Amino acid sequence: AAGEFKDEISPYEIVSHQPDLADGRRILTRNTVAEHDEGPRADTSVEGLAKLRPVFRNGQFGGTVTAGNSSQMSDGAGAVLLASAQALKDYGLTPLARFVSFSVAGVRPEVMGIGPIAAIPKALKQAGLTQDQLDWIELNEAFAAQSLAVIHDCGLDAAKVNPLGGAIALGHPLGATGAVRTATLVHGMRRRQQKYGMVTMCIGTGMGAAGIFEAL
């Protein structure tokens, strides 16, 4: 995916100040330019992931959730600009995509994580679309098990889901994920000359959200 995220990341400089442990009277200043997601790890291998132990177990059943198939702790920020047709005209802006529909729905809190199963059909109905018309699906994967459940229950085309990787590979900065996933979707569809895409994610306590976008 070299260069795939270039258009959606705005590099910025971070200035950090730390005491010099060898000389307590000095403060060291370091300048770092953040221009890549912190999540991807080039040294990750299938063999290494297979060695990780499950975090949860239920009686005699072996667990499936490991540090390797769960989203990591991430720092991040994201922003999108949502404008009306009149605002686009007034300020001379060229839109990248059209926000077609949005829905929020919920499932029982004890099965939190599969909220998108309830939200996706509502968003598609509002947009007047079917799943077959979606070219790209950004499904936030807090855990691989959660994503697989949504793909299975909704009958999503796995080949269209997270084609550039999801939160497990890239990170899941809470509060920024919606904007980040939307940026990936919109820029990706425009590069590939695709038309319709969806961003969906689970939210704590059983909620789920889904949004449909049309690339312009």
Show the residue positions of the predicted features.
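N-terminal extracellular/periplasmic Venus flytrap/periplasmic-binding protein-like
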Residues: 1-85, 90, 153, 158-160
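Condensing-enzyme catalytic core mediating Claisen C-C bond formation in acyl metabolism
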Residues: 44-114, 118, 122-125, 183-184, ...
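Active-site pocket-lining segment
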Residues: 12-15, 100-169
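Active-site-proximal alpha-helical scaffold in enzymes
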Residues: 1-4, 79-86, 151, 173-194, ...
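Cysteine-centered functional microenvironments
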Residues: 61-71, 102-103, 135-142, 161-177, ...
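Short acidic, glycine/serine/threonine-rich loops at helix termini
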Residues: 22-25, 93, 110-112, 173, ...
